[in-house]
A protein has these predicted regions:
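Boundary/entry segment of secreted carbohydrate-active catalytic domains
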Residues: 1-28
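C-terminal domain-boundary segment and adjacent tail
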Residues: 2-10, 38-40, 115, 147-156, ...
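Hydrophobic "anchor" residues on beta-strands that sit immediately upstream
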Residues: 19-20, 84, 226
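A Trp-anchored, charged/polar loop motif used as the substrate-binding/catalytic surface
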Residues: 26, 171-186
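Short, well-ordered alpha-helical microsegments
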Residues: 27-31, 133-136, 262
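Metal-dependent polysaccharide deacetylase catalytic core of the NodB/CE4 family, i.e.
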Residues: 37-146, 153-166, 170, 193-201
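Well-ordered, non-membrane alpha-helical segments in soluble/globular domains
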Residues: 66-72, 107, 177-182, 210-216
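Non-membrane alpha-helical structural segments and their capping/turn regions in soluble enzymes
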Residues: 100-105, 175, 207-210
Length: 286
């Protein structure tokens, strides 16, 4: 077969993927979702079913008051259409601090309620306060989640090794945000890259910096070599890639998943692996 270095590519033979993740289901999501849609980007919005519709004002010394009221249950399905809804715990409790029965209740009731509102199974979760332990991960898996996001910035574009320790690249207020965006779009190398930004919609009001996310989305949107996907779509794609089955000499690859996959086997050779099909791989040079 010649020399090979099989490397994952994203749909359409793209080498880059961009996703975002925003928490708490605050009313600022209405403006944020519109910005996402206007720029053709996608993300995951992590909601607390138990507080949807709750009215609240955040007050902190030396800071302006910020409306942190939550969106209404009735608008969830239409507001987040085209994006992804994820779980964030029923009441945004520190799940790792709770007894296991109550932690499971928070996870299950949140997921069940949000699934009724969206009409589809939830795949993604964001840890409240970024806090988790082995018990929380085990309960999330039992509830049917496929992955969960932390709040630990990596400043890198590496693909996740553990879907339940999904570390983002950075928060939108990170001083290196636009530098990272530039590195992501224009950096050299052939390995797949994931740029993953997170935050809370209310922070744009509190910091009076909506121009920050507008600048990022204007810069990131509209690139043909970038796959714009939700958190769940990316993890599902990576999971399907892990399921590939090789013949012993590498001349055939079977894709048992329901997802078309894309692969680079050398600098000159790329393959599309159709869902549920076995593909004969083209020869590569020695």
């Amino acid at each position: 077969m010649g020399k090979r270095f099989d490397t994952l590519l994203f749909p359409g033979f793209r080498s880059k993927a961009f996703t975002l993740s925003y928490d708490d289901g605050v009313i600022q999501d209405r403006r944020l979702v519109k910005l996402f849609n206007d720029h053709g980007v996608k993300g995951t919005f992590n909601l607390n079913y138990g507080v949807l519709g709750h009215q609240d004002i955040a007050r902190a010394p030396g800071r302006p008051e910020v409306d942190i009221s939550k969106v209404m249950k009735e608008e969830v399905k239409t507001l987040y259409a085209g994006q992804e809804v994820g779980g964030h715990g029923l009441y945004h409790s520190d799940l790792a601090s709770l007894g296991e029965p109550y932690a499971m209740y928070e996870i299950i009731e949140d997921k069940a309620g949000l699934e009724k509102l969206t009409g589809k199974p939830l795949e993604m979760f964001a840890y409240p306060f970024g806090i988790y332990n082995d018990m929380v991960i085990r309960l999330l898996k039992s509830a049917g989640y496929k992955g969960a996001r932390t709040i630990r910035s990596t400043h890198s574009f590496e693909l996740p090794k553990d879907p339940f320790v999904l570390d983002p690249t950075c928060h939108h207020n990170d001083e290196k945000l636009m530098e990272l965006a530039d590195q992501f779009l224009h950096g050299k190398g052939f390995k797949p890259k994931l740029f993953y930004v997170w935050g809370h919609g209310y922070e744009f009001d509190g910091d009076s910096n909506w121009e920050r996310i507008e600048e990022l989305l204007s810069y990131m949107g509209g690139h043909d070599d970038v796959w714009y996907a939700t958190n769940g779509e990316i993890l599902s794609y990576l999971k399907a890639y892990e399921m590939l089955e090789y013949s012993v000499d590498g001349s055939f690859i079977y894709n048992p998943s329901c997802t078309d996959l894309y692969l680079m086997t050398s600098f000159l050779t790329k393959e599309e692996l159709k869902a549920g099909s076995c593909t004969q791989i083209k020869e590569t040079s020695l």
